[in-house]
Amino acid sequence: QREIETPEPQGYEVLLKTVACGVCHSDVHIHDGYFDLGGGVQLPSPLPGGEPLTMGHEIFGEVVAVGEDVEGIEIGSKYVAYPWMGCGDCDLCNDDMTHYCANNSNLGIHVAGGYGDHVLVPDTKYLFDAGDTPDSLAGSYACRGLTAYSALKKAGPYTKDNSLVIVSAGGLGLLALK
């Protein structure tokens, strides 16, 4: 463990105090240094050059500071931090498809995430109101929630004449049932 300076937000950045941060199975792979693809095949994890990294991408936090260009975000408000961030310069990022960017800077995977006391979110567009979702679950919806939703959307359309089988009763499978 080491102490890391609390960042000071600039421009459109927002500093969140971590309220809750889920543990995703991807975090286990990143910690281990590889994704186990089965059959002895391993895909190296995306850790940046062996540098220490504060992991955690299922982030829910409270705004404690904002950059000078931020408008409409109040200190004390709580938000889910959308972790899937692109480079901001490529065609995909310019078309608001940052989650497909090959040069991404995902929170908790490529840049400091929510397992620390604070996380610096680069822009207010990555903050989402969690509504009445419990604090302990809110951040996980930016990962497991989107994963389950995306799978269901790709499997559709649904009618009374077709069926869908959800195999598994883990976090993703149970959320898909909701």
Residue spans of the language-model regions?
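Mid-domain Rossmann-like dinucleotide-binding core that forms the NAD(H)/NADP(H) cofactor-binding site
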Residues: D117, D132-K178
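Short cysteine/histidine-rich zinc-coordinating motifs and their immediately flanking basic loops
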Residues: D36, C101-L107
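Short Gly/aromatic-enriched secondary-structure transition segments
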Residues: H29-D36
